[in-house]
Amino acid sequence: MRRHPQLYEVNARIFLNRLSSTAGHRVTLSTIPDQAWLELAEKGFDLVWLMGAWQRSSAARQRALSLPGLRHEYDSVLPGWSEDDVAGSPYAIYSYSLDPPLGETTELAGLRDRLNRLGMGLILDFVPNHLALDHPWVYARPQLFLAGREEGRHLHPDWFFSPDGNAPIAHGRDPYFPPWTDTAQVNFYSAELRDALVQELLAIAGMADGVRCDMAMLGLNQVFQRTWGDVLAEPSMPGIEFWDEAIGRVRARNPSFIFIAEAYWGLEQTLQGLGFDFTYDKAFYDCLRFCGASEVRSHLSSPDFNLSKGVRFIENHDEPRVAAVFG
């Protein structure tokens, strides 16, 4: 792979829905026409990020249908939408198995092999900070999630939910926004939780060439402490960072496995130091969108972090379409 690979994001569900509509029958990962991938290879892309491949949550979907703010958003982006159009968030993961509408989980390794033959690699999502609020672990292994001190729960009752009337569990969140109420927050201070996440990563490494890690900085000890300090029951943080442990264990078996971090808040260099191959360069996007040429040049000459490891983009699923922003 090139030192500076080109990454192409594909919304898995939309992509397959369009192919199925064109073909007049259901298309799954293994029946995607070769031409679809050839076109990307011929355009010079090295990696395909299949966004939203994992099984979504029925409870998260119901939450997505019930929130007035989200329904207003649907009206804006898809006038005339129906409930069948709402699949729920791809980042409230019920299981690290292929979402059934996309095919069978075994098709992922087959897709990776097809892409490899064309000189490309497959990138899949990994969401370390939280799982769907109805994930099986919520009921079978609740100790993996953040329960917090009772005083903290009284202080922030909207941060917690009680699955089926059981002990409270926190919703996933970052320190600057309200919680994601379709999720359950994992406890990064738990050795058992860390091992469980590493096992998921090792399984993904058998199906893909790398992972794009959602909100990767939320797994840092200091960030977890800052986010949850009001409610944490554990008196002290672990002696090792989760990412140092996780990346080391995965690379011991899969030395070339790629780790890409969605990262903000000036923590890109920290994550690179823990083993990430690439980290988001959101500052570059913001310079392009809101500043002038001199600011862009200044950013590109900054010593703040290794620019060769920056992921630069002009759009992704979190940002407006490029034509709407840059014309």
What are these regions (language model features)?
Residues 1-327:
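Active-site and adjacent substrate-binding regions of carbohydrate-active enzymes
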